[in-house]
Amino acid sequence: MLFRSRTIPMLPERLSNKLCSLRQDEEKLCFSVIFELNEKADILASRIVRTAIRSNRRFTYEEAQDIIETGKGDFREEVLALNELAKLLRNKRFEDGAIDFDRYEVKFEINEKGKPLSVYFKESKESNHLIEEFMLLANRNVAEAIGKTIKGKSKKTFVYRIHEQPDPDKMQNFAEFIGRFGYKLKTTGSKGEITKSINALLDKAKGKPEQNLIETLAVRSMQKAKYSTHNIGHYGLSFPFYTHFTSPIRRYPDIDRKSVV
């Protein structure tokens, strides 16, 4: 549970922050999703394996962002290469019909007594997108590895993270509301046409006084993502297969996926 001034972990602190956490210069046993990508971020090969990992460096998002912006720092070549691949993966997602709900995060400045001093908006930067894209890639790959039926073998029962198509009535109401601000939204047609229209709307609203309102209502016009053993794909991400796998310390369903893998 995440509060303004503290975090209550799902697992005991000895597990979540020490034994199960990838701490610098400590060897940890892991499930790893390993990819071979070319310079265009095409997946040439992938595998899910048990590994032992020793982390050479633990970065904060701010430290990684500084390397991306300045080109200087520890493991600069690795960080910059990963960032270039992440940008390609991100562009491909949107080309395939993913929706760009990249909203500002509300943050609080807290004093030592837990009293909020100020509130501010935190914008996602390239370092955030870098982690996000490889997290999505791993989650998608695990879902595909389990969910795709292999000839001659029975389909395995698996829990997917699914996201249905938006309700037409909600979309129409949303389109009528934003029309008051002079915006237009396509609510009928192919999935690609609708998601392209949504992304164009969100892009046009950026920097405008009504940006936060439109982004909030756009999210509310969507269906809620949920877990299901019946896979229908993930509409918002535009993935035919998707699950939660990468955060077993803070999300119980991810522990369940690892037991299946």
Predicted regions and their residues:
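Electropositive polyanion-binding surfaces
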Residues: 1-261
